[in-house]
């Protein structure tokens, strides 16, 4: 019976072979899902995957790209947004 802390959905089972040809179960934390664009849903490059605890340890410049809407919108959507805003200005 696994310990209660391993029954969570955030734990992932990894099967390993131990000496004597017995298989044992290790539990690992699941990775965070990849960041996606808020407008089109495309995967964002330059945004790290990881739990909040791991990401807070990173430097500010490693957390998201250094451009407008970095970490929220993909470059194509940012370009479209800039054109729309410039035309309506």
Swiss-Prot record:
The keyword Lyase does not apply. One of its GO terms (molecular function) is structural constituent of ribosome. Keywords: Ribonucleoprotein, Ribosomal protein. Pfam families: Ribosomal_L34e. GO terms for cellular component: ribonucleoprotein complex; ribosome. GO terms for biological process: translation. It comes from the Archaea. InterPro entries: Ribosomal_eL34, Ribosomal_eL34_C_sf, Ribosomal_L34e_arc-type. Residues 1-22 are annotated as: Disordered. Belongs to the eukaryotic ribosomal protein eL34 family. HAMAP family: Ribosomal_eL34 (MF_00349). This is Large ribosomal subunit protein eL34. It comes from Methanococcus maripaludis (strain C7 / ATCC BAA-1331). The gene is rpl34e.
């Amino acid at each position: 019976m696994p310990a209660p802390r391993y029954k969570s959905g955030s734990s992932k089972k990894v099967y390993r072979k131990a000496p004597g040809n017995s298989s044992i179960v290790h539990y690992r934390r699941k990775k965070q899902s990849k960041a996606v664009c808020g407008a089109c849903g495309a995967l964002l490059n330059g945004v790290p995957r990881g739990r909040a605890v791991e990401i807070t340890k990173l430097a500010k410049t490693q957390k998201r790209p250094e451009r407008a809407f970095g970490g929220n919108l993909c470059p194509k959507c940012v370009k479209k947004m800039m054109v729309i805003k410039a035309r309506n200005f």
